[in-house]
């Protein structure tokens, strides 16, 4: 096998990358990663493992982070004090991460780890994998010095059958009645629902998203920052960046940004005017309207992400844990919670 690192996703053919990425999810797709390269807060690279014939067997993005604006991706926020890696391995956004490994190629995981170590070491730091799926964390854990750290939970809502009525019918009777009431009350409120590309509405959506972030204590995420983020995402993702929005009196009062990718519809962002009286605005924009479009597009699950997990369970979500795995500087080990040296033999820097 041959391991290499390239500087841009554009150096890797789309079809070759997508063969590994499509089962893994949106936030490791070729197009998404191309957009992430425009983010000025980090420098990207890509570790590739090929066989001697040149077939891509495994891969992982690597990010040398200079300024992390998202608290949930800051090591000082989510990792123990002794761990301060500045290189992210895998997806940097989306709270859903896994190494890209072809079927039967788990032996390549060691090569991905070794390449990430060398890349980080060149920059005087270490690497970590944030928000790994349970399956990915289980596969990678034997290669790292510390056990996986639980960061949160991930929610996928299965979409059985061929339409939203089939989804509702799959839920317990009490929940079926509640969802039908929430949809009916929202429809009776008379707000206008529009489906459109993000490129057509990123300014309105950016203003709503900034307000949502401010309500959740993220003061640095102002209107200019959120509008620029959505504009960059619209430019990178094109018509794949879909918005369903509620309007009243000519004004956007709520929106949901989502993507259909693989067999899943991925919710990326939801924001609303909390002062608007339309009933069940959040539930309709977060769940029911995207579910309708998911069925129209033929996907079979809705990725609802982290937070408010119990509300997602009540709407049929399957919930699984998300983990972090972090490397240590060569020569370090933990004794009684303190970094010491020398390392055991199997923790030496890889050849």
Regions found by a protein language model. Name each.
Residues 1-4, 14, 49-57, 64, ...:
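Solvent-exposed, well-ordered amphipathic alpha-helical segments
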Residues 2-77, 126-278:
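A conserved beta-strand-loop-helix scaffold within acyl/acetyltransferase catalytic domains
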Residues 43-45, 65-147, 264-319, 324:
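Acyl-donor binding region in acyl/amide transferases
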Residues 44, 85-92, 166-176, 195-199, ...:
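Noncatalytic linker/hinge segments flanking ATPase motor cores
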Residues 59-63, 93-109, 173-192, 244-247, ...:
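A broadly tuned preference for mixed-charge, low-complexity surface segments
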């Amino acid at each position: 096998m041959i391991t290499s690192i390239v500087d841009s996703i554009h150096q890797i053919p789309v079809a070759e990358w997508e063969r590994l990425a499509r089962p893994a999810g949106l936030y490791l797709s070729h197009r998404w990663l191309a957009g992430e390269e425009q983010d000025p807060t980090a420098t990207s690279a890509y570790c590739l493992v090929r066989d001697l014939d040149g077939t891509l067997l495994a891969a992982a993005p690597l990010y040398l982070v200079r300024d992390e604006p998202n608290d949930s991706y800051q090591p000082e926020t989510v990792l123990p004090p002794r761990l301060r890696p500045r290189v992210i391995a895998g997806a940097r956004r989306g709270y859903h991460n896994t190494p890209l490994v072809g079927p039967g190629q788990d032996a390549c995981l060691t090569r991905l780890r070794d390449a990430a170590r060398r890349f980080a070491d060149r920059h005087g730091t270490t690497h970590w994998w944030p928000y790994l799926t349970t399956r990915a964390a289980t596969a990678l854990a034997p290669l790292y010095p510390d056990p996986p750290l639980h960061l949160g939970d991930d929610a996928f809502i299965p979409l059985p059958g061929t339409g939203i009525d089939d989804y509702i019918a799959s839920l317990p009777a009490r929940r079926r009645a509640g969802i039908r009431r929430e949809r009916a009350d929202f429809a009776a409120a008379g707000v206008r629902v529009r489906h459109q590309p993000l490129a057509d509405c990123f300014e309105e959506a950016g203003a709503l998203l900034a307000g949502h972030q401010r309500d959740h204590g993220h003061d640095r995420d102002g209107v200019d920052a959120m509008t620029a983020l959505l504009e960059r995402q619209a430019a990178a993702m094109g018509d794949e960046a879909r918005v369903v929005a509620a309007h009243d009196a000519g004004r956007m009062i709520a929106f949901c940004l989502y993507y259909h990718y693989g067999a899943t519809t991925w919710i990326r962002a939801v924001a609303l005017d909390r002062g608007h009286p339309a009933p069940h605005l959040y539930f309709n924009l977060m769940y029911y309207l995207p579910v309708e479009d998911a069925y129209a597009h033929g996907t079979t699950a809705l990725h609802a992400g982290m937070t408010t997990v119990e509300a997602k369970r009540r709407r049929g979500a399957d919930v699984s844990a998300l983990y972090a795995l972090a490397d240590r500087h060569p020569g370090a080990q933990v004794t009684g919670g303190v970094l010491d040296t020398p390392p055991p033999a199997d923790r030496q820097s890889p050849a």
